[in-house]
Amino acid sequence: MKRITTFGDSIMGGIVLDQQNGQSAPRYTLLEESFSSRCASALGVEIKNHGRFGSTTRHGLRELDRWREQVTASDFVVTEFGGNDCDHCWKQIASDPEGEHRPIISLAHFKEQYRQMITTIRQLGSRPVMLSLPPIIADRYFDAFTRSMNSEQRGNVLRWLDNSVENITQWHEMYNLQLFKLSALLDVPIIDITTPFLVERNYREMFCDDGIHPNERGHRLIADTICHAATGYI
């Protein structure tokens, strides 16, 4: 049986928004039928999943070091990072909309830290495989992270976004594009899980209300995409 170790953020970890939660603060839960679980069953492989809520490439480097022996024993290591790296500290923007604000992990550091992860995986004797990022639903995400803000703070964030919540996607798209560039530069296979969403007319229905986490339907789509692509690797 092939062994696969995965590292990434909450999407890799199978975290979804608890849609039954009636509280103002969002609560998250682990999806039993996540794409990782579905892939393990469909492909007949063992998957050790180290996806973590809020993880960036900086965390990924630490996790790789922590699980070195497991990586060495794995046939493949699958990585999925970028969604948190490209995010912003929206509370700071709400307090100072005229200030200079950058993504949590700069694009330069994102590129370098991802490159270091790939190098480490190879040095430990495993084969890296990258995942691209699912798209985001900008208006839902804006509503989610401004829910606890007052009207002035919400207005400040919107003003910083040049009065268009769709501008949130520009960083996400930029970091996602960088993944494909890194794949080509480092000669690492990448599985495109972006396009399968975008070709669906109703892909918004495949995301939780927070606009960033795929729901069960979304995880099913990701699993189908990976399993189809994996026939070339496994």
Language-model regions, residue ranges each:
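Short N-terminal helix/helix-N-cap motif within the alpha/beta-hydrolase-1
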Residues: 15-16, 58, 88
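Alpha-helical cap/lid subdomain in secreted, periplasmic
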Residues: 63-234
